[in-house]
Amino acid sequence: MSQAAARLMERILQPVPEPFALLYRPESSGPGLLNVLIGEMSQPQVLADIDLPAPSIGAPRLDVLTLIPYCQIAERGFAAVDDQSPLLAMNITEQQTISIEQMLALLPNVPIQLNNERFDLSDASYAEIVSQVIANEIGSGEGANFVIKRTFLAEISEYQPASALSFFRHLLEREKGVYWTFIIHTGSRTFVGASPERHISVKDGLAVMNPISGTYRYPPAGPSLTEVMDFLADRKEADELYMVVDEELKMMARICEDGGHVLGPYLKEMTHLAHTEYFIEGRTRRDVREILHETLFAPTVTGSPLESACRVIERYEPQGRAYYSGMAALIGSDGKGGRSLDSAILIRTADIDNCGQVRISVGSTIVRHSEPLTEAAESRAKAAGLIAALKNQAASRFGDHLQVRAALASRNAYVSDFWLMNSQQRQQTQSDFSGRQVLIVDAEDTFTSMIAKQLRALGLVVTVRSFSDEYSFDGYDLVIMGPGPGNPSDVQLPKIDHLHVAIRSLLNQQRPFLAVCLSHQVLSLCLGLELQRKAIPNQGVQKQIDLFGNAERVGFYNTFAARSSSDRLDIDGIGTVEISRDSETGEVHALRGPAFASMQFHAESLLTQEGPRIIADLLRHALIHTPVDSSVSAAGR
């Protein structure tokens, strides 16, 4: 250990230390090395206000460590309880690296006595909230999945900074499979955690996100291969992961020139449980503060669609989240004149005040077929590594077992090749699309960003506008009316009313357009089709359907569905409309008519196997079947 590192550690081990951080980031700093940081704290109002020194040429350095509370998502205009948790930034003034062996030799190991241990919500109370979310939110079409938190509370007897450092030591010694193991002391509070999940990292212009979902809780005797295989075969667990991959693909589509490239899945094994995970990579030139802003916050700890999830969280968590589901982000200079970024989601994290009051918030992903009491048990398991004395038991590992690897690989057999390809492989420019202008109208679901990436790969020139923006249909060869949450019949809502008016305008002008999911439902109503709420929502469901004579595997995210008893309808003022539908239930999968097409499913989703081809075929139909004398002069809304 260098003398400089020893001096920093001596200051950190003082009875009243200055702000500091000890970070074990094996994927970034290298295995066996910890960052030792001391700095000065500030409270910027917004992420753009984080003060960064100019990038330098030479040795890489770390500049700022920021702690981003959940309520910071209000920056994006999304709903959030304002619990007065500030955005915190540590401007790093001194930094060193030391080995894990040297760190363990220095850290204290004092006994930790927890008093008054309890959850703020009992298992029964939490299960009741899960039931309400399934019935009232997922069941009403507000979204596909939501994460609702509960919080473990306790007091550390005779608390001192050495208690938190001992807690950090225990995690460092025993936790495995984590992305960051850390202690961050701000002066007024201390965060100690073992987060399994990267939020986003950027190095040499390559951005990486790491969606993790699905949970296997180890039994008291430890994991077994049979149970691991059962976990990997569980459709609910797979669906949870596919849904968060879709949501993070939306984010990557916003910040990366060519969108995200999906790698995996893999088994992530930890001390008390295991998860499944993917990685998503993409090239970006955006400022790191802008990247953090655009990725507030991970769907794995909020839900999807994100904007709708924020409204649900605000309704069911009136006390706010503080820093739970926020992030710790480390911004630096890469030594080549550019920025580096590494960040971890603030989960599996204890928030300790200077009196020793401990808060550990955890959550469970609620989907349409969640079992409420099972979700309560899962939330307890997620907290187990921090709550208990962290039993020093060796756990078996199965991530490299041939059967496990084969089971993981099989999850990609029927998903979209497009998102598994790199950007060069995706280019599928079609001569009849090259250079054509497309307007996408976003209805509060950034699946539209993924649609845009697929359209650009086909050679189209894409513009995305929110339904609430001023826009015109003039100058575009095609219009895509996008998906979003909500009841398509509720025209009292401004968004729904807007979609009805816009789609009727497109029909009247006979402009070529494609309607997706919510907009497909609005189109169905405009055409006089019956619309019903589904008894069991399709939220993150892959089905094989007959799409106008072709068997296709497609992904559905819908609570409402149009129905028809016929495969064709002749509609006055419109013409003949072809209907792709379920022959048993009559549920409508897609429509084709003069100058338009629509789909209830999401061709852009990871769950749709041949998404770009399906979109291309439907757009081609809309263009080819546009009447020669169609009006193109009237403006859209």
Swiss-Prot record:
Gene3D superfamilies recorded: 3.40.50.880, Anthranilate synthase
Catalytic activity: chorismate + L-glutamine = anthranilate + pyruvate + L-glutamate + H(+)
Domain of life: Bacteria
Pathway: Antibiotic biosynthesis; phenazine biosynthesis
Name of one Pfam family that matches: GATase
Anthranilate synthase component I, as annotated region: 1-434
InterPro entries in UniProt: ADC_synthase (IPR005801), Anth_synth_I-like (IPR019999), Chorismate_C (IPR015890), Class_I_gatase-like (IPR029062), GATASE (IPR017926), TrpG/PapA_dom (IPR006221)
E.C. number: 4.1.3.27
Molecular functions per Gene Ontology: anthranilate synthase activity; transferase activity
Swiss-Prot/TrEMBL keywords: Antibiotic biosynthesis, Glutamine amidotransferase, Lyase, Transferase, Virulence
Active site residues per record: 517 (for gatase activity), 602 (for gatase activity), 604 (for gatase activity)
Gene Ontology biological process terms in this record: L-tryptophan biosynthetic process; phenazine biosynthetic process
UniProt miscellaneous comment: Component I catalyzes the formation of anthranilate using ammonia rather than glutamine, whereas component II provides glutamine amidotransferase activity.
Role summary: Involved in the biosynthesis of the antibiotic, phenazine, a nitrogen-containing heterocyclic molecule having important roles in virulence, competition and biological control.
Name by which UniProt lists this protein: Anthranilate synthase, phenazine specific
Source organism per UniProt: Pseudomonas fluorescens
This protein's encoding gene: phzE
